[in-house]
């Protein structure tokens, strides 16, 4: 009893000391500020943080720093909003065999695997993420534990289980099938009542149009956005017809481009200003970097992906990816790189607002390194302007989730979600692979 009381007192003192440190104002001084709005960076910036929020922004010599503030030098650094990853799967850690994973580890999702994924994301500079497919109970619990400060991780916007025509055998906990429009509405209502932040729709080309429409209409009635797969042409056609808010991926086929009717339908949708932007999360890094990965599999040995992962799971993952170039999951990937580039360009031309997302957690895509690689691929393999790329990982995701009042840019009054990295990320975007400073809600984690 005495030992338990002692541990309780130590825990209480630890929490108290953290609160005391966080109670002091913080000043980030000297860095080059990229605020998320797309304007010219602010040199010699000063950012004042009080508690969880940003209270003032200025430059060295133009504003007074409170005498009791903790001063953190950001000289020589790029300072920018905490990154968003708009497509993660915290229930996955990069193992190559889904069937084995789904049979072996569900009992450890909520207690070990999802918290480890969340911590890895945060250490990579990801302070907000959309978790698009995981068991409902664990999704809510892990999100809420992060929000309460019990475990480290990004602010999570969770979908819980996929909504689809029929779950694959053994995946019923995180894939919910629907039978008819009434059942579709009931499933969405169940998710909404449980507290999800977003609805994930997949394989909608295998559902009736009434079912697809019921999912979207019910979700919107609960003020929840709907994201949907865009792997196959009919998924896009039905999603557009039903009013889906955001599409994921650019397709799994080797077709060289989108069919003409889909390009026209996308352009017609983006022209409807009253509906707001049509968002798209292409998740293309894995296609464009696959050849590099096979030539240099040493990158799979980065210990960052082992953070908080139990040793037996680390060993299992390593065993599953030991022959990286032989995984059936990726054999057609080299043939998709050209179509990915074409479709990305067509989406740009059609006026969609694209978001940074990675599908992290799928085979060989680790939460610790997927996000910066996606930004790097946009800039260095697709020629996207670095500032636009950064906005796709900061400002626009917050707009899509309708939380831009509090997130997405470094602005007075917003939550202090801030990262910093040595060097000029507008010239060398890959510097983001080594984030030096991570602040989330005013608390420094790195």
Residue ranges and their predicted role:
Residues 114-137, 154-161, 194-204, 225, ...:
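Divalent metal-dependent hydrolysis catalytic cores, especially in the metallo-beta-lactamase
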Residues 221, 324-329, 337-424:
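His/Asp/Glu-enriched, well-ordered alpha-helical/loop segment
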Residues 6-17:
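Bacterial N-terminal signal peptides
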Residues 33, 37-80:
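Histidine-rich, glycine-flanked metal-binding segment
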Residues 21-23:
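Boundary at the C-terminal end of the N-terminal hydrophobic targeting segment
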Residues 201-336, 362, 382-383, 401, ...:
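Active-site core of metal-dependent hydrolases
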Residues 77-145, 169, 210, 231-249:
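Metal-associated gating/positioning segment near the N- to mid-region
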Residues 90-109, 165-181, 251-257, 326-332:
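Acidic/histidine-rich helix-loop elements
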């Amino acid at each position: 009893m005495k030992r338990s009381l002692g541990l309780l007192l130590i825990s209480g003192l630890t929490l108290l000391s953290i609160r005391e440190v966080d109670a002091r104002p913080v000043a980030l001084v000297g860095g080059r500020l990229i605020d998320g709005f797309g304007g010219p960076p602010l040199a010699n910036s000063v950012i004042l943080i009080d508690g969880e929020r940003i209270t003032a922004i200025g430059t060295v010599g133009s504003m007074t720093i409170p005498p009791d503030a903790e001063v953190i030098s950001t000289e020589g650094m790029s300072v920018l909003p905490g990154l968003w990853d708009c497509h993660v799967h915290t229930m996955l850690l990069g193992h190559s065999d889904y069937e084995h994973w789904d049979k072996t580890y569900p009992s450890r999702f909520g207690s070990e695997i999802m918290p480890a994924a969340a911590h890895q994301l945060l250490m990579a500079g990801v302070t907000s993420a959309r978790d698009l497919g995981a068991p409902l109970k664990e999704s809510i619990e892990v999100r809420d534990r992060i929000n309460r400060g019990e475990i480290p991780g990004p602010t999570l916007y969770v979908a819980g289980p996929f909504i689809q025509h029929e779950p694959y055998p053994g995946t019923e906990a995180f894939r919910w099938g629907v039978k008819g429009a009434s059942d579709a509405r009931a499933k969405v209502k169940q998710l909404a009542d449980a507290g999800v932040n977003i609805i994930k729709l997949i394989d909608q080309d295998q559902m009736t149009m009434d079912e697809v429409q019921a999912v979207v209409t019910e979700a919107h009635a609960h003020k929840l956005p709907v994201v949907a797969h865009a792997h196959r042409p009919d998924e896009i056609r039905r999603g557009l017809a039903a009013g889906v808010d955001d599409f994921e991926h650019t397709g799994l086929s080797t077709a060289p481009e989108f069919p003409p009717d889909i390009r026209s339908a996308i352009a017609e949708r983006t022209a409807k200003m009253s509906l707001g932007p049509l968002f798209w999360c292409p998740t293309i890094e894995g296609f464009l970097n696959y050849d590099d990965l096979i030539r240099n599999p040493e990158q799979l040995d980065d210990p960052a992906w082992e953070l908080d992962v139990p040793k037996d799971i680390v060993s299992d993952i390593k065993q599953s990816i030991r022959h990286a170039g032989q995984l059936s999951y990726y054999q057609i990937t080299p043939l998709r790189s050209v179509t990915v580039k074409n479709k990305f360009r067509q989406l740009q031309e059609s006026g969609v607002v694209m978001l940074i997302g990675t599908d992290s957690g799928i085979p060989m895509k680790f939460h610790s390194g997927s996000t910066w690689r996606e930004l790097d691929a946009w800039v260095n393999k697709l020629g996207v302007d670095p500032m636009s790329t950064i906005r796709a990982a900061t400002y626009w995701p917050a707009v899509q989730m309708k939380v831009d009042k509090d997130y997405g840019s470094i602005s007075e009054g917003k939550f202090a979600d801030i990262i910093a990295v040595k060097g000029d990320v507008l010239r060398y975007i890959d510097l983001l692979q080594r984030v030096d400073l991570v602040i989330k809600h005013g608390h420094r984690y790195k």
